[in-house]
Regions:
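Charged, low-complexity C-terminal accessory regions
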Residues: 93-96, 103-195
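Short helix-terminating capping/connector loops at secondary-structure junctions
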Residues: 44-46, 91, 148-149, 210-213
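Core catalytic region of metal-dependent phosphoesterases/phosphodiesterases
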Residues: 4-128
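Conserved beta-sheet core of the metallophosphoesterase superfamily
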Residues: 153-255
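Beta-strand-turn-beta hairpins that frame and shape the catalytic cleft
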Residues: 6-18, 135-154, 212-215
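Short, flexible, glycine/charge-rich loop motifs used to bind or transfer phosphoryl groups or to couple energy/partner
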Residues: 6-8, 40, 84, 144-145, ...
Length: 258
């Protein structure tokens, strides 16, 4: 688990946080037009930022699950395309994680392609091969005389497992809270867009008090049209609509919408 500290301008009254995950660049069923549109939105929206949360590349190999013959281009070309696509928003990337599709190259050859993407984009210090806790600060508390920024903690990882059923995927998402205390939890991998909230009593040692807080949980979608491996294995068609997180810079408030 890596800690990443991000401080954004205090002038921001709110931010949009977009997650790019399970894009599967190189797969014949990747909706590249939709990906380009989402990247363009982040680039053109001053208060929009993003996380790259694994499986950016399809990265099928001869010895992995998947079909190398259904890929539009090879893994090296996939890496180059990913860097070209995300270059316009490289300054808006707050974290990059490692997915199971990128892990194919690591298991066989020790090559960490997700790190290479982060390095080429100039955000290697924001890369993690496992998970990350992001300490995000921006804005200014309304009416506060000490210029205090709003602070949010985000626990993010690509994820694993989850099964085929929606309930199992929801449990996988909720279980993130048993690992670390955070305001927001972001999970990908299971291709099911999902948003939920839970209450929690957070202790404060300095004041010897407990405060009731709300935690936000987000599971992201896959950017794939139906077909190929998913159809052959009888997986359900998935929605490509993925949650966007909205954070308030004047008070502690967080929501997500599909």
């Amino acid at each position: 688990m890596k800690t990443i500290k991000i401080t954004l301008p205090e002038e921001l009254q709110s931010i949009e946080l977009h997650t790019f995950a399970d894009e599967h660049i190189g797969d014949a069923h990747c909706d590249i037009k939709r990906l380009q549109e989402r990247i363009r939105h982040v680039a053109e929206t001053p208060n929009a930022y993003c996380i790259l949360n694994g499986d950016i590349l399809d990265n099928a190999t001869k010895t992995s699950i998947g079909d190398i013959y259904m890929q539009e281009f090879n893994p090296m070309e996939q890496l180059k395309r990913a860097v070209e696509l995300f270059a316009p928003i490289k300054d808006k990337i707050i974290a990059v994680t490692h997915g199971n599709h990128e892990a194919r190259a690591y298991r066989k050859e020790g090559l960490v392609v997700s790190y290479l993407i982060a390095q080429q984009l100039g955000v290697a210090e924001r890369y993690t091969q496992t998970s990350a806790v992001i300490f995000l600060r921006f804005g200014r508390t309304s009416g506060h005389t000490h210029n205090r920024a709003q602070r949010y903690t985000i626990y993010v990882l690509h994820g694993s497992g989850g099964g085929r059923k929606e309930g199992a995927k929801a449990i996988r998402l909720a279980d993130m809270a048993s690992i670390v205390d955070a305001d927001i939890y972001i999970h990908s991998h299971t291709h099911l867009p999902m948003i939920m909230k839970q209450g929690y009593f957070r202790t404060d040692l300095s004041s010897s008090t407990c405060q009731h807080v709300t935690k936000l949980f987000v599971n992201t979608a896959a950017n794939l049209d139906y077909g190929g491996y998913g159809a052959a294995q009888e997986f359900k068609p998935g929605s490509k609509d993925t949650p966007i997180i909205y954070l308030d810079g004047t008070r502690h408030g967080m929501t997500a919408r599909l």
